[in-house]
Design a protein with these regions (language model features):
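Short, amphipathic, aromatic/basic-enriched membrane-interface segments that mark the entry/exit
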Residues: 1-7, 58-64, 119
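A feature for the membrane-embedded catalytic helix bundles of lipid/isoprenoid biosynthetic enzymes
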Residues: 2, 13, 21, 34, ...
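N-terminal signal-anchor transmembrane alpha helix
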Residues: 8, 15-19
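Membrane-interface transmembrane helices that cradle and orient dolichyl/undecaprenyl
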Residues: 22-28
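Membrane-interface helix caps and helix-loop-helix hairpins in membrane proteins
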Residues: 26, 54-55
C-alpha cells in the first residue's frame, strides 16, 4: 500500500507540468481538465489511504504539500497565460505568496517543535477546495468556451484569494502568539 500511496503522490508531482503543456502548448483543455480533476481527487485519496492503512511515510509527508503547490502554481500560471488578465494575475500572486509564506511558517514551527500552530484548519481546506474548483472550472470553460464559466471561476478564485489571506493571517497569528 505504501508504494501505491507514493505512486499517487508522485503522479501529482508530475501532473502540474503536464497540465500546463496540455493547455498552453497543445490547447487540449478538456484533457488538462480531466488530469487536473484526477490530481485533485488523488490529493484526497493519497492522504486518506496512507492514514487508513498506516502507510504514511516521512517522504510522503514532505512530497504531498510540494505536489499540491506544483499543481497549483502550474495551473495558475497556465490560466494567467491563457487569459492574460491583470485581475487573475493579481489573485494568483496573492494565492501563491500565501502558499510560500505558510510553507515557511510550517517549516519554522516544525523546527521549533510546534507543528500544531500551523496544522491544516477547516478554513484552509475550504480555501483549497475553492482553488481546485475554480481552476477546474477555468479549464472546463476553455474546453467548451463558456463565458459564464469564466465569470464564475473568476469569482471563486477571488473568494479563494480572500480565504488565502485570512488563513495566512490566522497561521501567522498562531505562529507568533506566545504559548
Amino acid at each position: 500500500m505504501k508504494n501505491f500511496v507514493m505512486f499517487l503522490t508522485i503522479s501529482r508531482l508530475i501532473s502540474g507540468p503536464i497540465i500546463f503543456f496540455l493547455a498552453n502548448i497543445f490547447e487540449q483543455y478538456l484533457i488538462a481538465f480531466v488530469i487536473f480533476l484526477l490530481s485533485a481527487v488523488t490529493d484526497f485519496f493519497d492522504g486518506f489511504l496512507a492514514r487508513r492503512y498506516q502507510a504514511e511515510s516521512s517522504l510522503g509527508k514532505v512530497l504531498d504539500p510540494i505536489a499540491d503547490k506544483i499543481i497549483l502554481v502550474c495551473a495558475l500560471v497556465s490560466i494567467n497565460l491563457l487569459i492574460d488578465s491583470i485581475y487573475i494575475g493579481f489573485l494568483s500572486i496573492i494565492i501563491i505568496s500565501r502558499e510560500i509564506w505558510v510553507s515557511g511558517l510550517r517549516e519554522h514551527n516544525s523546527q521549533m517543535g510546534k507543528t500544531s500552530k500551523t496544522s491544516v484548519s477547516l478554513l484552509a481546506k475550504y480555501k483549497t477546495a475553492t482553488q481546485f474548483f475554480s481552476i477546474a472550472l477555468y479549464y472546463y470553460s476553455f474546453a467548451y468556451n463558456l463565458a459564464l464559466g469564466f465569470f464564475i471561476a473568476g469569482f471563486i478564485l477571488f473568494l479563494s484569494a480572500i480565504l488565502s489571506i485570512k488563513t495566512a493571517l490566522d497561521y501567522t497569528k498562531n505562529t507568533f502568539q506566545e504559548n
